[in-house]
Amino acid sequence: IEDEYGNVLHASGGYAAPAAYAAPVAYAAPVAKAVVAAPAVAYAAPVAKAVVAEPVAYPKYEFNYGVHDAHTGDIKQQSEARDGDVVKGSYSLVEPDGSTRTVEYQADDHNGFNAVVHRTPGTHPVAVAPVAVAHAPVAVAHAPIAYH
């Protein structure tokens, strides 16, 4: 039985597979062109280049800074100087108990790093604000007693 388009219908009521499939007209391998040329050889005299060493800057600096925050009690300072391979400096800070810790240091190639620590008692301890702790009230609810 054929439908209105000329396809053969089977008992299942579906359409039949096409009778033929189209195949490519021709297969071809890729075309490779062979190019033959003489190698390009060039001879040149060696290039002489003078290498100039970059000048190394002599390391020399000095700095210092300080912080004095009376609200938080953060009080400190530092200073340092470098001349070639020798570094000298110091820093100090106020400890929570009001004392001052001072560190003096020096570093060089011959002796390495050396530090001396001094502690100076404070004239008065730094007041630290007390921590306020508030506890929430405990909620207690008793369940009714159940009788059987």
From Swiss-Prot:
Q: Which PROSITE patterns match?
A: CHIT_BIND_RR_1 (PS00233), CHIT_BIND_RR_2 (PS51155)
The reply on keyword Repeat is: yes
Q: Where is the Chitin-binding type R&R domain?
A: 58-128
Its keywords, alphabetically, are:
Cuticle, Repeat
Q: This protein's superkingdom?
A: Eukaryota
Q: Give a yes or no for keyword Endoplasmic reticulum in this entry.
A: no
sequence repeat residues: 16-19, 22, 28-31, 37-40, 44-47
PANTHER family, sorted: CUTICULAR PROTEIN 76BD, ISOFORM C-RELATED, STRUCTURAL CONTITUENT OF CUTICLE
What is the protein's given name? Cuticle protein 8
What organism, scientifically named, is this protein from? Locusta migratoria
- Record lineage: Eukaryota, Metazoa, Ecdysozoa, Arthropoda, Hexapoda
